[in-house]
C-alpha cells in the first residue's frame, strides 16, 4: 500500500507528492508513478484511494495510493488512511503499509486503522456472498520501529483490541 500527499510545498511537477515514508515504493515503481497517479485522477486529498497496477521492481500485484491531505497528518488521519487502504485491498491475501509510522503513536494509529479496516461482517450474506470480497488476512506495517520492544507491545495491544472489536461487531 502506498501513500501520497497533496501539500503544495512539496508537490511534484505532477501536482502530487510522495509521502517521505513511501519513497522506497516510489523508487521501486519508477519515475512514472506520480504521472500515472495524476492520470488516474489522484489528487492527494485525505481519504482518496487510487489503485494502480505494479511496475518497475515492485513485487506486489497492485499499488494502492491513499491521500493524506496535509504533509504531516495527525494520528487520526493516519488511522483513517490505513483503514481506507486495507478496505481497498479487500480480496487480497496480504498487504504491506508504507505509511508514516516513526513514533509509537503513529504506529498505533496505522495498526489500528489497518486492523479495524480489515473487518467485514458477512455471516448473513446469502445472495451477495459471492460478490463480497473477503477482507485482507495479513497486514504488515513497514516501519523503522520493527525491532523496538515497546513498538511490539503497541502492536500486541492493538491486535487484542481489534480482535475484541471484531467479536463485538459480529
Residue ranges of each PLM-predicted region?
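Glycine-/small-residue-enriched capping loops at alpha/beta junctions
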Residues: 1-170
Amino acid at each position: 500500500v502506498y501513500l501520497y500527499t497533496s501539500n503544495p510545498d512539496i508537490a511534484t511537477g505532477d501536482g502530487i507528492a510522495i509521502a517521505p515514508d513511501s519513497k522506497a515504493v516510489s523508487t521501486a515503481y519508477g519515475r512514472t508513478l506520480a504521472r500515472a497517479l495524476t492520470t488516474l485522477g489522484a489528487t492527494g486529498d485525505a481519504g482518496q484511494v487510487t489503485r494502480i497496477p505494479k511496475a518497475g521492481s515492485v513485487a506486489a500485484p497492485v499499488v494502492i495510493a491513499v491521500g493524506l491531505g496535509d504533509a504531516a497528518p495527525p494520528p487520526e488521519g493516519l488511522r483513517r488512511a490505513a483503514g481506507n487502504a486495507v478496505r481497498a485491498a479487500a480480496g487480497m491475501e496480504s498487504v504491506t503499509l508504507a505509511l508514516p509510522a516513526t513514533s509509537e503513536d503513529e504506529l498505533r494509529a496505522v495498526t489500528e486503522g489497518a486492523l479495524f479496516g480489515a473487518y467485514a461482517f458477512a455471516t448473513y450474506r446469502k445472495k451477495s456472498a459471492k460478490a463480497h470480497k473477503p477482507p485482507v488476512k495479513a497486514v504488515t506495517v513497514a516501519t523503522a520501529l520493527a525491532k523496538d520492544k515497546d513498538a511490539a507491545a503497541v502492536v500486541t495491544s492493538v491486535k487484542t483490541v481489534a480482535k475484541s472489536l471484531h467479536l463485538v461487531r459480529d
